[in-house]
């Protein structure tokens, strides 16, 4: 798979501090068994890399931080 960069993710979430929070939260969800939202067949990517791939693909955004705080 192509290498993911922080710049790819910053196009979706321009604030790097919010990007860090979203990536960490989503990586924790993936590590706890959540289904990946991007195609991963046979990929050995760690949850943090998967989270960044999902953000760069536009599948995950700031909305994950607002869930449960309604």
UniProtKB/Swiss-Prot annotation:
It holds the Pfam family RNA_pol_Rpb6. GO terms for molecular function: DNA binding; DNA-directed RNA polymerase activity. This is DNA-directed RNA polymerase subunit omega. The RNAP catalytic core consists of 2 alpha, 1 beta, 1 beta' and 1 omega subunit. When a sigma factor is associated with the core the holoenzyme is formed, which can initiate transcription. It catalyses: RNA(n) + a ribonucleoside 5'-triphosphate = RNA(n+1) + diphosphate. The lineage of its organism: Bacteria, Pseudomonadati, Pseudomonadota, Betaproteobacteria, Nitrosomonadales. GO terms for cellular component: DNA-directed RNA polymerase complex. Transmembrane segments: none annotated. The keyword Cytoplasm does not apply. Promotes RNA polymerase assembly. Latches the N- and C-terminal regions of the beta' subunit thereby facilitating its interaction with the beta and alpha subunits. Keywords: DNA-directed RNA polymerase, Nucleotidyltransferase, Transcription, Transferase. It is an enzyme of class 2 (transferase). InterPro entries: DNA-dir_RNA_pol_omega (IPR003716), Pol_omega/Rpo6/RPB6 (IPR006110), RPB6/omega-like_sf (IPR036161). Belongs to the RNA polymerase subunit omega family. Its EC number is 2.7.7.6. Gene3D superfamilies: 3.90.940.10. SUPFAM superfamilies: RPB6/omega subunit-like (SSF63562). The gene is rpoZ. One of its GO terms (biological process) is DNA-templated transcription.
């Amino acid at each position: 798979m192509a290498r993911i960069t922080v710049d790819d993710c910053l196009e979706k979430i321009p604030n790097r501090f919010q990007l860090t929070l979203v990536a960490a939260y989503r990586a924790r969800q993936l590590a706890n068994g959540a289904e990946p939202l991007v195609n991963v067949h046979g990929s050995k990517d760690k949850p943090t890399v998967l989270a960044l791939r999902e953000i760069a693909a536009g599948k995950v955004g700031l909305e994950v931080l607002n869930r449960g705080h309604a």
